A protein has these predicted regions:
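Short beta-strand segments
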Residues: 17-51, 59, 66-69, 79-84
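Extreme N-terminal tail/first-helix region
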Residues: 1-21
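Short, structured beta-strand-loop surface elements
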Residues: 52-115
């Protein structure tokens, strides 16, 4: 049996958590951590953020991000090592709708309320 890919295991663990800290980077390299909801999407992860947010602007110029399991308030446990990743953004309506459905299935009512705000 082939050995499990540790990246896949990390992706599964992150996708199963309630929140991850998504850290994007300003042009000057300064990190900007934000707790976000996350859902597994094949061998990657998907998150949602409204159009025009700082996260999207930063990902647009610097796709390098780090992700780590965190609390709702964004606290990362001392023993958690952030995972380096590459983020992409989409505004394709079909893709946004598909990811929104995945998040709604995982988070239920709290996600639906979030989408109303």
């Amino acid at each position: 049996m082939p050995a499990a890919d540790p990246r896949t295991n990390a992706t599964l663990a992150l996708g199963a958590s309630d929140f991850i800290q998504l850290t994007t980077f300003r042009r000057n390299g300064e990190p900007v951590p934000t707790p976000v909801w996350v859902v597994p999407d094949g061998d990657t992860l998907a998150v949602f953020t409204p159009a025009g947010t700082g996260k999207l602007k930063r990902i647009g110029h610097t796709p390098r991000v780090t992700v780590a399991v965190c609390t709702r308030g964004g606290r990362v446990a001392d023993d958690v090592v952030p995972v380096e990743a590459h983020a992409t953004a989409t505004d394709d309506p079909a893709e946004v709708a598909r990811i929104t459905r995945l998040l709604a299935d995982k988070y239920g009512l709290q996600f639906k309320i979030f989408m109303l705000v």
